[in-house]
């Protein structure tokens, strides 16, 4: 009875963690120890932080244009060509050195400005979601292009936030002659958890002192320590058999699809005997060509998620054994390849506490009636509580007991967090109570809600960079936590081998299909103030 009560308590705690995170918009944010905001710095530091925030306020139009432009590109993972060309163009014009094609990934890049220590990295994701096309500002399902991808995770907003912050900080660094280096980078193919482990292998973070990440949410928030959620391995299993006429001589065939189905059946029976924390799911990516041909080739794609390295590795081993068993039962051959991976996240206490002080100073944007009307409109459409938009920032949380983590989503920022002191800023560019990875999550992402949320987030990010540049004790404390607490007992072990390569072919066919029509609707800021205006959308449109 005691064990059952403990498990139920852990489940309820995990549910609360997810609810709090969704409400605050932070990545992590699970209950645990309440953090302590970093005390204000010396007067000159605080003066410069106020100055950088005021400067970002004057950059609102440029920020809005970046957010809208990337939204209109709507590119899937590994296919973010227009997005990367556009963003690197802005940075290059502002004096950043650009290294393109980083880690052998055509859409990956690093933009660097400055010299010396500390080296502060600013990262955020840029890819979007299949079949999530949606007109912004419209509070019901209304695709821009039916079936096309769209920013149903809000990844059009994070790098514009970082660019805004970096340009404002750069101005102060030049004037004040502050030593230090700014390093901007994009999260390519995050929805495939497909790139960041290759960045690490290629050395992107070897000289970085602190990494500040940004991810869209519905509130301003940050947490430290082990958050809720999981890491994962993304594995494709391909079975090879022998074709035959499915009616005339089926006994001469060896069905690769049978092997896929046997593996899926086996895994579904195995679920009952796996830990509650695990999440596993699959899609059949090749199931044959037509019913009258015994499929000679078939593939299934699995995500194996767990809360720590050892259990993720164990799930992969179970999957491999099950695939081998399925091949034996069907007299087929099986091979596998890794398409992506992510470590569970662990965020830095010092960096998070520093960031939270700036969150308190900036606070949430001032939402107007139109913003709240759109938010309540889509919440009503989805039959969710009509709470509107966030009006109060959450608490700084951290130090979650691993036993309280009952699983959840994954993000390959986890790999980065185990290689350099990292904190993730959740910023209020979206609407609470949305399902995630859905057309509904694209509704706000080229509207004043996103524009205001990104500006608020850029202020927090820039102020945190100023703190790190001018208060070397914070960088040292962040390093101490990373070395003496986070990685004292657990070291980073990559899920990829030296021979594994990024899955660059993923999403090619989808973008080839929809890209030409999407290109006709790219945002043109020389003709229209906003993307809403270009699309002829009255803000807000609800029913």
Go through the PLM ranges and name each one:
Residues 28-29, 258-261, 265, 269-273, ...:
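His/Asp/Glu-rich mid-to-C-terminal helical/loop segments that flank catalytic regions of hydrolases
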Residues 376-458, 476-543:
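Zn-dependent metallopeptidase/amidohydrolase metal-coordination segment
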Residues 250-286, 291-293, 306-337, 345-387, ...:
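Acidic-enriched catalytic cores of C-N bond-cleaving enzymes acting on peptides and small amides
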Residues 141-150, 156-157, 173-295, 305, ...:
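Histidine/acidic-residue-rich, glycine-tolerant segments that coordinate divalent metal ions
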Residues 1-11:
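Bacterial N-terminal signal peptides that target proteins for export
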Residues 70, 91, 111, 122, ...:
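Divalent metal-coordination and catalytic microenvironments
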Residues 9-19:
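Bacterial N-terminal signal peptides
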Residues 24-31, 35-151, 160-180:
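Acidic/His- and Gly-rich active-site-bordering loop/insert found
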């Amino acid at each position: 009875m005691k064990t059952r009560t403990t498990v139920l308590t852990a489940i309820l705690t995990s549910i609360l963690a997810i609810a709090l995170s969704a409400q605050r918009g932070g990545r992590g944010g699970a209950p645990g120890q309440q953090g302590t905001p970093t005390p204000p710095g010396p007067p000159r530091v605080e003066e410069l932080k106020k100055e950088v925030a005021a400067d970002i306020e004057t950059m609102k139009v440029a920020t809005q244009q970046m957010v809208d432009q990337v939204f209109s590109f709507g590119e899937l993972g590994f296919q973010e060509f227009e997005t990367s060309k556009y963003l690197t163009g802005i940075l290059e014009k502002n004096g950043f050195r650009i290294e393109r094609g980083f880690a052998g990934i055509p859409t990956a890049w690093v933009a660097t400005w400055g010299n010396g220590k500390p080296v502060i990295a600013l990262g955020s994701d840029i890819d979007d979601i299949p079949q999530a096309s949606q007109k912004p500002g419209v509070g019901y399902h209304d695709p821009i292009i039916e079936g096309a991808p769209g920013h149903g995770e809000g990844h059009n907003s994070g790098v514009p936030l970082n660019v805004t912050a970096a340009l404002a900080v750069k101005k102060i660094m030049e004037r004040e002659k502050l030593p230090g280096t700014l390093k901007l980078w994009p999260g390519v193919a995050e929805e495939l958890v497909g790139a960041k482990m290759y960045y690490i292998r290629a050395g992107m973070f070897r000289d970085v002192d602190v990494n500040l990440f940004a991810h869209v949410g519905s509130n301003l928030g940050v947490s430290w320590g082990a958050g809720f959620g999981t890491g994962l391995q993304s594995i494709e299993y391909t079975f090879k058999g022998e074709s035959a006429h499915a009616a005339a001589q089926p006994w001469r065939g060896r069905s690769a699809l049978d092997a896929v189905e046997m593996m899926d059946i086996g895994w579904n029976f195995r679920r009952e005997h796996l830990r509650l924390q695990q999440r596993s799911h699959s899609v059949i990516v090749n199931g044959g060509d037509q019913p009258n041909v015994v499929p000679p080739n078939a593939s299934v794609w699995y995500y194996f998620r767990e809360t720590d390295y050892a259990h993720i590795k164990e799930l992969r081993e179970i999957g491999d054994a099950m695939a081998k068993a399925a091949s034996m039962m069907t007299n087929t051959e099986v091979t596998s390849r890794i398409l992506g991976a992510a470590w569970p996240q662990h965020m830095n206490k010092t960096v998070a506490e520093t960031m939270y002080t700036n969150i308190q100073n900036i606070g949430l944007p001032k939402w107007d009636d139109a913003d709240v009307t759109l938010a309540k409109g889509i919440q009503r459409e989805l039959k969710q509580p009509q709470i509107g938009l966030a009006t109060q920032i959450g608490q700084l949380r951290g130090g979650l007991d691993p036993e309280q983590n009952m699983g959840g989503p994954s993000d390959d920022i986890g790999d980065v967090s185990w290689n350099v002191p990292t904190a993730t800023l959740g910023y209020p560019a979206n609407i609470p109570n949305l399902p995630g990875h859905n057309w509904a999550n694209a509704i706000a992402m080229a509207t004043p809600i996103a524009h205001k949320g990104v500006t608020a987030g850029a202020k927090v990010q820039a102020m945190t960079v100023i703190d790190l540049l001018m208060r070397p004790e914070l960088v040292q404390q962040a390093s101490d936590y990373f070395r003496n607490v986070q990685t004292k007992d657990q070291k980073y072990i990559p899920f990829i081998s030296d021979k594994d390569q990024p899955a660059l072919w993923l999403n090619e066919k989808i973008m080839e299909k929809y890209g030409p029509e999407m290109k006709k609707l790219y945002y043109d800021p020389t003709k229209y103030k906003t993307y809403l205006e270009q699309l002829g959308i009255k803000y807000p449109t609800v029913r």
